[in-house]
Amino acid sequence: MSWTKKRERLHEAAVSTIRAISNNKKISSNTGLSQRPPTSDHVALPNVPRSFKDLNKWRGESDFQAFWHLFHKKSKDFQLTLPARMIFNELEIARVELLGSSKYLGSARNISEYTLSLIHISEPTRPST
């Protein structure tokens, strides 16, 4: 099987996993830039990475989207300034990631690697004892 076919299968598996975790079979998907937070009943996943070392980062994004669809609760729309809305969204993203990571333990590493890649940190540092 060619690497291209394997990458397509990984994408399909990620979308199936998102549907299963979120208990939402209606979720549609495409390949492209992820939206944070995602839109309702849709996920956009970046292309599967060519390098195995980047696979956990990629999985972290799909884990986040699954957790968003599982744990995010639609609240009443209330008026917020743009900076306040951005902070509110980031707090909600952190909340669903924490809830998901506590339920699905393997996803914590994936989400950590993805988050660190967003701020361009390649390896988590550990405090010395």
Please identify what each model-predicted range represents.
Residues M1-L118, S122, R126:
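Basic/hydrophobic alpha-helical interface regions
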